[in-house]
Each structure stands twice: as structure tokens, then as C-alpha cells.
């Protein structure tokens, strides 16, 4: 025996990998053609082939001396093996010999690796790869091993699995069905012993790293199924089989341990996926009859897989393993593939995972412990950077967040919401800062923490879009900090600005209206009880472009003025940013409700002023009381100023659609009536107040006159105005308003059945005012700005608390001279109807410092030019001078009006005005500012469009000016010149022929060499306009340069770094493709000429 062991040891030293792999190939096929010949055999032919392969291998061992060492190694391993190797069943004999050769391969690879001693690398040739370990398998050798493993699993494991355990062999391949029929289950050894032997031998082979990766990557599921059956399948106690054919309890225990060791060893998502397959998963619809006939997994296996999956889940990083295990099979993560985008859209699968994660397994000691371990891993799913998996992981995390918040709100608040919102809670004015944190300059919240916090809140609240109570209540305390952060991001560029805005808009839209109004009061500073940023904390721009929260530096005496200025400007900016935020909340009605709240606050301000006048004399107060009184007075004045500032901003930012329902309009009118009554009580009635009151009552008249379809519920709301209207009718000094108030009371009380003439006249007067201003409102919209409306004007004029906002039912005329207003409201004037006095008044208004007056005057002059008014056209030089001077104005409404005027004037006298404009556009920066040149460029573009076919007359000066502008050092001017060049070329058609080469050379040079992105975009856009404008004529007009343009577009698509320029180039290529298709394959006209013979 000792001699045999010595020989065996020598065999291990001399036996090589090539010999073992050659033996394995011999077992696969006698012709060496791999497994292809076996896959086409049937039953008897397969058995004969297996016998032939076994005989050929034994002949090699007996007759070929070169195989002697391998034979000795195989015999040594066979002696150590504890399983029966010979059987009447050929399939088992084949499997047994294959397993022995795999064990020989493993032992040889271990021996070769142990004896390998690589030399030291040569420092002179560091680029040379290190020596390869002798136990490494080549690609072809790995394929051979994979074929062998497939046969071992197919013949040694799959046939012996119980129904419902694993995927049946006959449903995998046609060859698998053949194998299932040729296995002899009656021959020794028993099927259970065969399964145990195969699994144990394969796990032994898998101890080598290289071989283990080949086994587990492809056959983990089958081995796991076998170990589950061996270790956990209930045994029948009634009929005991012979001892050699029954697994002992020790072997079952070893099988259970091997299963758990294998699950811990492999890639965890792979383990999760295979366990789900073993468990059976949800029933799937399938038209395949074979698939429908598959047995369901037995109950013990389903329970076992559920237990093992729960163990995988509760391990470190178990959540990620479960998510990857379920999703990767469909294209996410490491698996990737063409189905990744399909999987990203499959939200149902992500939601199913979320339900699994939110359900506490039975193995957990308590839900508290489970969620304490799971929730941090769920939060980590939000922070994956891989674009392919990020969407799915975030969907799973968001849905888990929502599900847990719905089912276990107290645990969600403790383990999910508190960690997410912790950076914001840390800097609240209600939080207690430690002494170490109060050192000036200390970073309380880092840039990464704050960015991650805002992104997580956005994903949970806005993306999840579930207004659960626990979610709303958790976010309410930090809304003040969130709003201040939003205000800070508005001061500079920040990637979290849009996230903060979306979060605030979402929460304000989902909150109850009272809570939303309370939050807005806190944002504006009207409610000090709302939690906000700690007085010692401040936002600062971080080094990576984000935002961090730090402790303020101590303010010295010299910096007190600067600190006060910063405080005042920040408060003013906060109110303006609140107005911007509310401008997005008009459709839901929140902006209207907050506006009405501010109106009511104005009434309180008036009443507070009255009480202040009746205060006790200072002589009756102590010094402490006097100081407290002065503090309260200062706070009260600050609140009043804040309310006035809020009203001014809201009037400026809100559109006429601020009120979305009848209730809001009635509340607005009620607030106006209350304020009027309060003013009467204080004897402070004014003309502006009378106009405001008249307009608000006109609103009610419009609604009662049929502008709004009123229901019985609306009349119930309108009845709230009856006491106020009665008070106005009894106390207001103006008899017209008194009469209107009485008539409105009658109409409301009778539900509109009786309406006096005064009500109808008031409604018509209000609607006429709206029509009067309709044209100017359109001009305001085109300038993309909202100039201060009449409510703001009233507020500034009286400086006392009056306002009348625009609503969806009325709007007020701007304050401009009558001479300006009259011509603009007449659209059908005849030539000569404008008098000299009117013209002079409008010309004077064109120099008025008030922006609305000046803009209206410019629009009026433009209208007269468009109508060819003789008086206006006689002063063309004067008008041109006025328009050109106003081009340099900074207000959008003014200079856009001036641009329109110059364009209309040039349309009338192009030969006189166009040369001056071209000279001004072509001038240097010293003569005109870049902004003015850009505005002149806009004028030239409008002139080119207006001239149409007549533009050919001025082709030479226009095209030369634009080509020179492309060489200007200012990038914005170059882009403007290219835009104008595109408009011009689009309209020249065949007249472009003589300069087509110059234009093409210019575009190619700019698109390839210009350093500014906007200029390159403009050049490519010119090509798009050129092809789009010429359409089918492009093959004739651009015949000489079409190839150059095609090469340019391909160059941009392939090499241009800017995505917008690439998009323009792609659009141009599509235009060119359509042009050429229509040129080469013109559409067939299915028509036939019918000639009538004389």
C-alpha cells in the first residue's frame, strides 16, 4: 500500500493538465467533436455511445504508457472515494468516471500551483507581463471543463431530483428529455445515494477557485436543489430501505451544512435568484403545455427557500443582494444587456421587491430589530451612481419607504425619516447645539450631507407622491430651513435649487390649506413660532459647488452696518422668492388664499394703528414696561412693513388668474369691504380707496350679470357679503356706491332673479376696463415680465394699505396720458384721424420716465406707422431717432416696443433706414454697446422677414454685413450674425447662387474652429434653416456645395462635444436625407391626362 501511495505521489508530480483534459474529451465523444454528436442521439444510441466512451478510456489506460501516471492518480482517488463507482446503469458508471477525472484535475491544479515559484520581475522590462501560473486553464480548456460539468449535472443530479424540486430536465433541452428516459433507477446504487455522491464530489472539485467559478456560475441552482432535497426533504419512516441505500443522519446534516456554506460563498444576488427559482415564484402565464404541466414546488421546499431568503436579506448588504438578485436576471446591474431599459420601466417588479423588504420575516426576533438593520440599507439604495441600476434601486427604495410609512409609521419615522432629515434638524432654532459645535466657522452640515439629504427628500416625497400623515408631519418642522435654503440657491447657480422648489411646491400643494397658509406665514416671517434656521447658522457655498451649513463668525463693531444691510436685503429677497414660489401655486388656489390672508392683515394693520393712538401716556409706565412697549412697537412696525412688502410683491408677481373659484373672489371682495369700513371709521376715505371699492363691487356685479355660471352653493357664499354691503350702503359718503351696494344686496338675496340697471352698468363698466387694457397685457406677456399692476400703483401712491389685484374677472387700466391711450384703443382709424396735438402728446410721453407710459407711447407710435398715418409718417426721422434711443433702454417692455417700431418704420422706408441700421450693426464696440448691437440685429431679422421676396434688392449690403459680423470678436455678435444670415439665405432661394461658396466656407470654418459653443450651434442651425427653407430646391441651389455641407454635418455628429449642436446637425442630416430621397425617388403621381379631341 505504501508503494502504491509513493507511485501515486509521483503521478501527481508528473501528470499534466493536458492529459486529464484529453481524457475528458475522450469521454465526451469518441470522434472528439464535443457534445454535438451526443445531442442528436436517441435512447439506445446514447447508451451505446456512453459504453463506447468508457471502453475507449479504459483501453487508453491499459495500452498507452503515456496515460500510466493519470491512471495511477485516478486509482488513488478512486480508492479514497466512498461511493460505488461501477453499476449496471451505464449513465452512473459514466458519471462516476467523469467525477474521478474532475477530482484528478483539481488535485493536479493544486499541486502545480503549490510548486510554482515565479522569478523576480526584471526592473529593466517592467512592461512585460508576469509569468502565468501553471494551473491556469486556457479558453478552450475551460470550454471542455464546462461541457464535462454539464454532463455530470445532467446525468448525476437532475434525473434524481423529486418532482417540483428545481427545473425538470425534460423541459430544458431535447437532449435532457432523452437522458431522463435512459437513466435506470432500479439499478444500484440508489437514486438518493447517486445524488449525494454527485453533489459531494462537485463541491469537492469547487474548492479550487477556478473550477469553483465554473461550477457555481452555471450549475449553482441544480446543486442547491440537490442539497435541499438531501438535507431537508422529509423521510418516510414506514418503509426502511437497506442501510447502504439510505442516507444517515450525519450525511443529511453534512448536506445541510454544505448548502449553507455554499450560499455564503457565492455571489449573493446569484444565491437569491436561484432560491427564488427553487421556491417556484409567482405563477406565470405561458402558452407552452409542458410548462403548464410542471409540478409546483413542495411545501417543505417553499418554506425552506423562504427561510434561506430571509437569512440572505438579514445579512450585511442583504437588501442590495435581494434587489440585485431579482432585477439582474431581467437586465439590470451586472447582467446588463439589451433588456435593461425594458426592466427599468417594469415598475411592478420593483414594487414587489419593496413589499418583500417592508414585510418583517418570521425569523426576526422583533420588527424593531429587523427594521433597525434593514432601513439603513434601504437608504443606501438611493445613492447608487450607476445610471443603469440607479433608477430601479431608487424606485425600490422609494416604494419601500412609502410602504413602511403606511404600514408601520412609528418605525418609519424612527429609522427612515429621522436619518434622512437629520442634517436639517441639526440646524433648527429649536435644536440644542453643543459647545464644540458653536465655535465660529464650524461646519455643522457638510456639502455632501446636505446634497444627499435634499436629493433623498425629493425622491421620497416628490417622486413617491404619497401624502401620508407621517411623511407630512416629519417634513413640516424643517420647511423653514428648506425655504431659506431655496432662497440661498436663488443667489447663485446650484444643482439643488430645482429640487428645493419641487419639494416646497409638493408639500404646499398636499398640506391642508390652513397648515399651508401657516407655513407660508413662517416663510414670510409673519409667524415666529414656525421653526427656522438657527440664529448662529448660515449657508455658505462649498468648495465643490454645493452648499454647507456653518456657524457664523463673530460680528465686530466695524461690520455692524454691513451685517444690518445683509439682514435687510436677505429679508427683502426672502419675500421676493416667496412671490416667485407662489407664482407656481396659482392653479391650486393657494396663492389666492394667501393673497386674501394678506388683505385681511392689511385691515388688522389699520385697526392696530387706531389702537396705538389711544395708548396710555409714557409717564404712567416704568422703565421696564416702557422698554417692552417700545420693543412691541418696533416688532409691530416691522410686521406692518412686511405685510405691505408682501402685498407689493404678490401684486407684481401674480397673474390675473390668481383667483380660481367664486369663494376666493368673494373673500377678496369681503376683505376690501371690511377695509373700506375700517377706513370710514377712521375717517380716512380717499379717491384711490373709492376706485378700489368700486372695482371690487363691480366684480360682484360681473358675476351676478352672468360672466360666471353661479350655483346655489355660490349664492350661499355670496350671502356673506350682505352685512358688509348693508354697512357700506348706510355709511359710505358716495351716493353711487351706496346705491350699488343696495342693488347688489337685492340681487344676491333674490339669487339673481331681480337685477337693477345699476348692477348691469357696473358689470359693463368693469368688463370695458378689461377690454381697454387687453392689448397692453399682451405686450406685457410678450416681454416675459410682469410690470407692477394698478394695485401696486395704488399702494405706492397712498402709502397706506390700499390694494386692488388683478383677477380672472377684471383688470385695471394703466396710468398713462389720455393721448397715448386713445389711439391705442382704436384699431380702425382712417388716415388723417390723428391730430397734431395727439401726436405731440405721444411724442412727449415717449420720453416719460415712467416705464408703462413710455412703452405705451412707443406701441402707439408703432400702431400709427402700421396704419400709415400721414401725420406720423411725415416725422419719420424724428420717430427713428426716438426708437433708436429707446433701443438702449434696459427694460424689456420698452426696448421690445422700440424694436417693433424700427422694424415697422423700415418696412415703410427700407432704402432710407436700412443702411443706417446696417452701419450701426457693423460698428465697433466703442461706438455702440454689445447689447445695442444685439437689439439692432433683432430689428434686422424682423426686417428680413417682413421684406419677404423684396429682400433680394438689398442682398449685397445685408449678406456682406452679416459675413463681416461672423468675424467679430464678440461671440454673441457672431451668433447674432449667423442667425440673421440663416434668415436671409432661407429667403434668397436661387439668388443665393453667386455667394453660396462664401456662405458655405464661412459656416464650415465657424462650425469646426470657433471656440464658443453658442456660435457653433448657430452655424449648424443656419444649415438647418437653409435646407428646411430650400426644401426640394436645395439640390439645384446648393448643388455645388451639398457634398461639403454633408461632410460638415457628419463631422459635427461624430466629433462635436456639444449635445445641442449634435442635435441640430442630426436634424439637418434628416432634412438632407428626405430631400435626396424625394430627388432620387420622386412620388408617383397616379394621374392620367384626358384630351378632348376637336
From Swiss-Prot:
Composition bias, Polar residues: 796-813, 821-834
Cross-referenced Gene3D superfamilies: Leucine-rich Repeat Variant
The HEAT repeat ranges on this chain: 873-909, 952-988
Membrane topology per record: Single-pass membrane protein
Disulfide bonds: none
Pfam families reported for this sequence: ARM_TANGO6, RTP1_C1, RTP1_C2, TANGO6_N
Major site of localization recorded for this protein: membrane
Keyword Transmembrane helix: yes
Stored InterPro entries: ARM-like, ARM-type_fold, Rtp1_C1, Rtp1_C2, TANGO6/Rtp1
PANTHER family from the UniProt entry: TRANSPORT AND GOLGI ORGANIZATION PROTEIN 6 FAMILY MEMBER, TRANSPORT AND GOLGI ORGANIZATION PROTEIN 6 HOMOLOG
Record protein name field: Transport and Golgi organization protein 6 homolog
Native source organism of the sequence: Homo sapiens
Amino acid at each position: 500500500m505504501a508503494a502504491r501511495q509513493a507511485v501515486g505521489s509521483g503521478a501527481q508530480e508528473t501528470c499534466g493538465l493536458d492529459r486529464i483534459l484529453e481524457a475528458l474529451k475522450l469521454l465526451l465523444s469518441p470522434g472528439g467533436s464535443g457534445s454535438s454528436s451526443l445531442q442528436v442521439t436517441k435512447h439506445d444510441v446514447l447508451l451505446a455511445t456512453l459504453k463506447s466512451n468508457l471502453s475507449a478510456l479504459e483501453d487508453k489506460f491499459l495500452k498507452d504508457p503515456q496515460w500510466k501516471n493519470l491512471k495511477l492518480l485516478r486509482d488513488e482517488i478512486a480508492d479514497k472515494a466512498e461511493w460505488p463507482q461501477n453499476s449496471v446503469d451505464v449513465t452512473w458508471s459514466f458519471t462516476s468516471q467523469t467525477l474521478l477525472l474532475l477530482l484528478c484535475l483539481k488535485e493536479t491544479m493544486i499541486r502545480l500551483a503549490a510548486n510554482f515559484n515565479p522569478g523576480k520581475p526584471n526592473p529593466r522590462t517592467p512592461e512585460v507581463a508576469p509569468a502565468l501560473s501553471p494551473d491556469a486553464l486556457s479558453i478552450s480548456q475551460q470550454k471542455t471543463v464546462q461541457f464535462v460539468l454539464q454532463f455530470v449535472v445532467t446525468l448525476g443530479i437532475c434525473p434524481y431530483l423529486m418532482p417540483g424540486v428545481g427545473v425538470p430536465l425534460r423541459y430544458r433541452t431535447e437532449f435532457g428529455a432523452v437522458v431522463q428516459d435512459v437513466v435506470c433507477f432500479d439499478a444500484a446504487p440508489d437514486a438518493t445515494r447517486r445524488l449525494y455522491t454527485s453533489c459531494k464530489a462537485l463541491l469537492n472539485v469547487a474548492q479550487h477557485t477556478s473550477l469553483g467559478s465554473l461550477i457555481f456560475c452555471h450549475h449553482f441552482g441544480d446543486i442547491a436543489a440537490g442539497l435541499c432535497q438531501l438535507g431537508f426533504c422529509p423521510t418516510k419512516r414506514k418503509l426502511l430501505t437497506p442501510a447502504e441505500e439510505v442516507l444517515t443522519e450525519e450525511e443529511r446534516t453534512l448536506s445541510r451544512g454544505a448548502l449553507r456554506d455554499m450560499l455564503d460563498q457565492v455571489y449573493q444576488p446569484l444565491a437569491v435568484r436561484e432560491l427564488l427559482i427553487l421556491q417556484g415564484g409567482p405563477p406565470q402565464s405561458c402558452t407552452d403545455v409542458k410548462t403548464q404541466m410542471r409540478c409546483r414546488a413542495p411545501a417543505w421546499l417553499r418554506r425552506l427557500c423562504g427561510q434561506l431568503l430571509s437569512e440572505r436579506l438579514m445579512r450585511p448588504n442583504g437588501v442590495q443582494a435581494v434587489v440585485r438578485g431579482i432585477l439582474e436576471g431581467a437586465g439590470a446591474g451586472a447582467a446588463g444587456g439589451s433588456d435593461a431599459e425594458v426592466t427599468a420601466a417594469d415598475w411592478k417588479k420593483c414594487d414587489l421587491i419593496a413589499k418583500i423588504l417592508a414585510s418583517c420575516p418570521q425569523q426576526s426576533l422583533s420588527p424593531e430589530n429587523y427594521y433597525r438593520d434593514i432601513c439603513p440599507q434601504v437608504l443606501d439604495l438611493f445613492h447608487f451612481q450607476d445610471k443603469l441600476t440607479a433608477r430601479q434601486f431608487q424606485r425600490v427604495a422609494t416604494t419601500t419607504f412609502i410602504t413602511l410609512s403606511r404600514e408601520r409609521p412609528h418605525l418609519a419615522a424612527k429609522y427612515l425619516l429621522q436619518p434622512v432629515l437629520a442634517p436639517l434638524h441639526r440646524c433648527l432654532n429649536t435644536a440644542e447645539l453643543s459647545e464644540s459645535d458653536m465655535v465660529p466657522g464650524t461646519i455643522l452640515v457638510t456639502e455632501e450631507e446636505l446634497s444627499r439629504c435634499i436629493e433623498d427628500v425629493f425622491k421620497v416625497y416628490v417622486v413617491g407622491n404619497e401624502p401620508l400623515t407621517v411623511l407630512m408631519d416629519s417634513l413640516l418642522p424643517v420647511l423653514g430651513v428648506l425655504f431659506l435654503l431655496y432662497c440661498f440657491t436663488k443667489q447663485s447657480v446650484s444643482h439643488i435649487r430645482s429640487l428645493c422648489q419641487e419639494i416646497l411646491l409638493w408639500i404646499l400643494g398636499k398640506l391642508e390649506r390652513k397648515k399651508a397658509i401657516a407655513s407660508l406665514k413662517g416663510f414670510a416671517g409673519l409667524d415666529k413660532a414656525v421653526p427656522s434656521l438657527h440664529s448662529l447658522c448660515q449657508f455658505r457655498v462649498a468648495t465643490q459647488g454645493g452648499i454647507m451649513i456653518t456657524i457664523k463668525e463673530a460680528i465686530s463693531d466695524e461690520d455692524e452696518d454691513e451685517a444690518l444691510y445683509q439682514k435687510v436685503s436677505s429679508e427683502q429677497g426672502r419675500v421676493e422668492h416667496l412671490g416667485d414660489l407662489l407664482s407656481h401655486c396659482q392653479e391650486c388656489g393657494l396663492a389666492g388664499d394667501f393673497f386674501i390672508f394678506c388683505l385681511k392683515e392689511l385691515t388688522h394693520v389699520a385697526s392696530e394703528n387706531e389702537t396705538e393712538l389711544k395708548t396710555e401716556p409714557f409717564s404712567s409706565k416704568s422703565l421696564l414696561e416702557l422698554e417692552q412697549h417700545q420693543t412691541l412697537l418696533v416688532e409691530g412696525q416691522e410686521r406692518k412693513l412686511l405685510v405691505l412688502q408682501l402685498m407689493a410683491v404678490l401684486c407684481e408677481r401674480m397673474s390675473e388668474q390668481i383667483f380660481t373659484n367664486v369663494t376666493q373672489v368673494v373673500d377678496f371682495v369681503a376683505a376690501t369691504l371690511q377695509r373700506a369700513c375700517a377706513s370710514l371709521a377712521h375717517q380716512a376715505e380717499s379717491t384711490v380707496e373709492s376706485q378700489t371699492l368700486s372695482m371690487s363691487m363691480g366684480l360682484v356685479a360681473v358675476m351676478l350679470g352672468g360672466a360666471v355660471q353661479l350655483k346655489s352653493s355660490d349664492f350661499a357664499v355670496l350671502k356673506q357679503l350682505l352685512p358688509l354691503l348693508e354697512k357700506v350702503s348706510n355709511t359710505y359718503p358716495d351716493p353711487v356706491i351706496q346705491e350699488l351696494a343696495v342693488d347688489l344686496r337685492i340681487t344676491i338675496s333674490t339669487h339673481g332673479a331681480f337685477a337693477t340697471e345699476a348692477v348691469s352698468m357696473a358689470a359693463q363698466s368693469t368688463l370695458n376696463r378689461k377690454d381697454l387694457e387687453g392689448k397692453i397685457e399682451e405686450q406685457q406677456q410678450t416681454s416675459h415680465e410682469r410690470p407692477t399692476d394698478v394695485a401696486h400703483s395704488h399702494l405706492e401712491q397712498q402709502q397706506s394699505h390700499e390694494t386692488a389685484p388683478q383677477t380672472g374677472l377684471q383688470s385695471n387700466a394703466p396710468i398713462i396720458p389720455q393721448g397715448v391711450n386713445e389711439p391705442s384703443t382704436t384699431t380702425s382709424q382712417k388716415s388723417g384721424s390723428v391730430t397734431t396735438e395727439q401726436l405731440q402728446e405721444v411724442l412727449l410721453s415717449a420720453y416719460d420716465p415712467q416705464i408703462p407710459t413710455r412703452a405705451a407711447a412707443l406701441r402707439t407710435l408703432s400702431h400709427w406707422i402700421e396704419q400709415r398715418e400721414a401725420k406720423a409718417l411725415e416725422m419719420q426721422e424724428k420717430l427713428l431717432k426716438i426708437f433708436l434711443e429707446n433701443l438702449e433702454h434696459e427694460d424689456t417692455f420698452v426696448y421690445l416696443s422700440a424694436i417693433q417700431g424700427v422694424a415697422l418704420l423700415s418696412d415703410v422706408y427700407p432704402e432710407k433706414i436700412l443702411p443706417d441700421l446696417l452701419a450701426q450693426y457693423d460698428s465697433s464696440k466703442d461706438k455702440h454697446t454689445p447689447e445695442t448691437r444685439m437689439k439692432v440685429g433683432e430689428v434686422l431679422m424682423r426686417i428680413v422677414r417682413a421684406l419677404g421676396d423684396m429682400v433680394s434688392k438689398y442682398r449685397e449690403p445685408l449678406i456682406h454685413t452679416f459675413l463681416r459680423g461672423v468675424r467679430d470678436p464678440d461671440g454673441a455678435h457672431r451668433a447674432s450674425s449667423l442667425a440673421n444670415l440663416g434668415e436671409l439665405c432661407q429667403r434668397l432661394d436661387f439668388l443665393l447662387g453667386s455667394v453660396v461658396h462664401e456662405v458655405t466656407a464661412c459656416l464650415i470654418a465657424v462650425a469646426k474652429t470657433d471656440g464658443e459653443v453658442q456660435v457653433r450651434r448657430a452655424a449648424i442651425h443656419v444649415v438647418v434653416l437653409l435646407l428646411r427653407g430650400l426644401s426640394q430646391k436645395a439640390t439645384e441651389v446648393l448643388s455645388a456645395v451639398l457634398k461639403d455641407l454633408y461632410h460638415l454635418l457628419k463631422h459635427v455628429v461624430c466629433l462635436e462635444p456639444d449635445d445641442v449642436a449634435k442635435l441640430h446637425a442630426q436634424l439637418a442630416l434628416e432634412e438632407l436625407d428626405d430631400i435626396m430621397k424625394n430627388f432620387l425617388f420622386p412620388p408617383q403621381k397616379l394621374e392620367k391626362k384626358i384630351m378632348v379631341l376637336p
